[in-house]
């Protein structure tokens, strides 16, 4: 477990799949469509976000490996977050993403943790900035969601920056 001031990140268990599905009414993600297959995949790491004030699970963070060349040392983590609607806008997501980046740097050898979000998702972009991530740029037409292609913004934090 990784504990912050507002939230704690704990191990994801099979009973948490319902939590993931319930947090998905969000136009900027499509987790609900892939919960059964993707969240059982060993290649995706995941932790549940628990609000410290009441001990209630309020969402999850996940990560998967991305590579920037054939050298294994060029691997990085791409992270994602999903919160139940009533937990949004309170700083909980910013802290959870910062804690996840710190956890990944402490437990793996990567030099880079990145996140991407829809160019229109101002709330998540603000959360990433508050978590210590740096905006890098736009990937045009990079994500297929809701029957069309969307541009995404890439944010990152390097080892030693968070």
Language model features: what each stretch is:
Residues 1-28, 46-162:
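Acyl-donor (CoA/ACP) binding surface of acyl/acetyltransferases
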Residues 38-43, 133:
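Short loop/turn motifs at secondary-structure junctions and domain boundaries
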Residues 31:
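Short, conserved clusters of charged catalytic residues that mark active-site
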Residues 34-36:
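Short, basic/aromatic recognition patches
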């Amino acid at each position: 477990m990784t504990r912050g001031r507002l939230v704690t990140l704990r191990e994801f268990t099979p009973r948490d799949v319902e939590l993931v599905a319930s947090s998905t009414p969000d136009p900027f993600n499509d987790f609900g469509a892939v919960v059964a297959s993707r969240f059982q995949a060993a290649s995706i790491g995941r932790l549940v976000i628990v609000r410290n004030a009441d001990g209630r699970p309020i969402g999850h963070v996940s990560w998967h490996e991305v590579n920037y060349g054939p050298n294994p040392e060029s691997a990085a983590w791409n992270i994602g977050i999903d919160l139940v609607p009533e937990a949004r806008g309170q700083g909980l997501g910013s802290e959870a993403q910062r804690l996840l980046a710190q956890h990944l740097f402490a437990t793996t050898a990567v030099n880079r943790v990145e996140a991407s979000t829809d160019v229109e998702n101002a709330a998540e972009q603000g959360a990433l900035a508050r978590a210590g991530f740096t905006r890098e740029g736009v990937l045009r037409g990079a994500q297929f969601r809701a029957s069309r292609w969307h541009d995404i913004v890439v944010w990152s934090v390097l080892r030693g920056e968070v």
